[in-house]
């Protein structure tokens, strides 16, 4: 996890041209193996931190310690040590074993479960979920960058936010999409339009993939190992995958068209 060179103001949604999202535009994906995790037994159950505000340090290799704050969105049922976290100023959702990853330092609970935010328009929320969309971001010099993607679900805890992924970058992001829709920066693509990679016909959905380990071969021939951790309800062929060497959550359609 690297600190972005410059984080945008909270809530501002901009992308550098061909870059990543707000706050993570300059963030490098670290492809390093996680350190051996501590396996000390616990004499009592851990406190449920889902919905809590947290802070912690982050130490990777010889790099300086950086400080992070965020909200714990969810605990992954198939791997209870893995949590999904929305960090302040970062648009990607991260998956971290907060209690076991040795790079996480001095984990603190800043507050008890935060009050769930409410959406302003439930009907509009239901309209955009599961849809292929075009999402406009402010690029360099005030230009507009168009990103095609799919709205996956309403985010847990932070209910005014939505999970979304993109053709250009198939990892899990979250934004306040209703505001973008009302401002004309989010457009639902017509059903007849060419669908993004995650938009597949519903037939042939594979059951029982949750918890399965997967292997991905990169262009250089090296392999990555990960686990399927979630199935998208509105698009059952689409799954979340957490790779062992990365804290991003990847979104893939695991059912090929015949």
UniProtKB/Swiss-Prot annotation:
<protein>
    <recommendedName>
        <fullName>Spindlin-2A</fullName>
    </recommendedName>
</protein>
<feature type="region of interest" description="Disordered">
    <location>
        <begin position="1"/>
        <end position="49"/>
    </location>
</feature>
<dbReference type="GO" id="GO:0005654">
    <property type="term" value="C:nucleoplasm"/>
</dbReference>
<dbReference type="GO" id="GO:0005829">
    <property type="term" value="C:cytosol"/>
</dbReference>
<dbReference type="GO" id="GO:0007276">
    <property type="term" value="P:gamete generation"/>
</dbReference>
<feature type="region of interest" description="Tudor-like domain 1">
    <location>
        <begin position="50"/>
        <end position="99"/>
    </location>
</feature>
<dbReference type="GO" id="GO:0035064">
    <property type="term" value="F:methylated histone binding"/>
</dbReference>
<feature type="compositionally biased region" description="Basic residues">
    <location>
        <begin position="28"/>
        <end position="39"/>
    </location>
</feature>
<feature type="region of interest" description="Tudor-like domain 2">
    <location>
        <begin position="129"/>
        <end position="178"/>
    </location>
</feature>
<feature type="site" description="Histone H3K4me3 and H3R8me2a binding">
    <location>
        <position position="180"/>
    </location>
</feature>
<feature type="region of interest" description="Histone H3K4me3 and H3R8me2a binding">
    <location>
        <position position="138"/>
    </location>
</feature>
<dbReference type="InterPro" id="IPR003671">
    <property type="entry name" value="SPIN/Ssty"/>
</dbReference>
<keyword id="KW-0131">Cell cycle</keyword>
<dbReference type="InterPro" id="IPR042567">
    <property type="entry name" value="SPIN/Ssty_sf"/>
</dbReference>
<feature type="compositionally biased region" description="Low complexity">
    <location>
        <begin position="1"/>
        <end position="23"/>
    </location>
</feature>
<feature type="site" description="Histone H3K4me3 and H3R8me2a binding">
    <location>
        <position position="169"/>
    </location>
</feature>
<comment type="subunit">
    <text>Interacts with C11orf84/SPINDOC.</text>
</comment>
<feature type="site" description="Histone H3K4me3 and H3R8me2a binding">
    <location>
        <position position="176"/>
    </location>
</feature>
<comment type="function">
    <text>May be involved in the regulation of cell cycle progression. Exhibits H3K4me3-binding activity.</text>
</comment>
<dbReference type="Pfam" id="PF02513">
    <property type="entry name" value="Spin-Ssty"/>
</dbReference>
<comment type="similarity">
    <text>Belongs to the SPIN/STSY family.</text>
</comment>
<feature type="region of interest" description="Tudor-like domain 3">
    <location>
        <begin position="210"/>
        <end position="255"/>
    </location>
</feature>
<feature type="region of interest" description="Histone H3K4me3 and H3R8me2a binding">
    <location>
        <begin position="246"/>
        <end position="248"/>
    </location>
</feature>
<dbReference type="GO" id="GO:0006355">
    <property type="term" value="P:regulation of DNA-templated transcription"/>
</dbReference>
<dbReference type="GO" id="GO:0140002">
    <property type="term" value="F:histone H3K4me3 reader activity"/>
</dbReference>
<keyword id="KW-0539">Nucleus</keyword>
């Amino acid at each position: 996890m690297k600190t972005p060179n410059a984080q945008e103001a909270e809530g501002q949604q901009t992308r550098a041209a061909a870059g990543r999202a707000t706050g993570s535009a300059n963030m490098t994906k670290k492809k390093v193996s996680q350190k051996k995790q501590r396996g000390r037994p616990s004499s009592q159950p851990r406190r449920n931190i889902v919905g809590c505000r947290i802070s912690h340090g982050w130490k990777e290799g010889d790099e300086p310690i950086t400080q992070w704050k965020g909200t714990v969105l969810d605990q992954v049922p198939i791997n209870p040590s893995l949590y999904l976290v929305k960090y302040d100023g970062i648009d990607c959702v991260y998956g971290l074993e907060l209690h076991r990853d040795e790079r996480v330092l001095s984990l603190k609970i800043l507050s008890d479960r935060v009050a769930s935010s409410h959406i302003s328009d439930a009907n509009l929320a239901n309209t955009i979920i599961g849809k292929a969309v075009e999402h406009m971001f402010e690029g360099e010099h005030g230009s507009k960058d168009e990103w095609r993607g799919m709205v996956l679900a309403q985010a847990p805890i932070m209910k005014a936010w939505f999970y979304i992924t993109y053709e250009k970058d198939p990892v899990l992001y979250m934004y306040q999409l209703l505001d973008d829709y009302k401002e004309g920066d989010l457009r639902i693509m017509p059903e007849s339009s060419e669908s993004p990679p995650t938009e597949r016909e519903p037939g042939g959905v594979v059951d029982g993939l949750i918890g399965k380990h997967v292997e991905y071969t990169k262009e250089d021939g090296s392999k990555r190992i990960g686990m399927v951790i979630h199935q998208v309800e509105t698009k059952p062929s689409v799954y979340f995958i957490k790779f062992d060497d990365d804290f991003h959550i990847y979104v893939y359609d695991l059912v090929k068209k015949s």
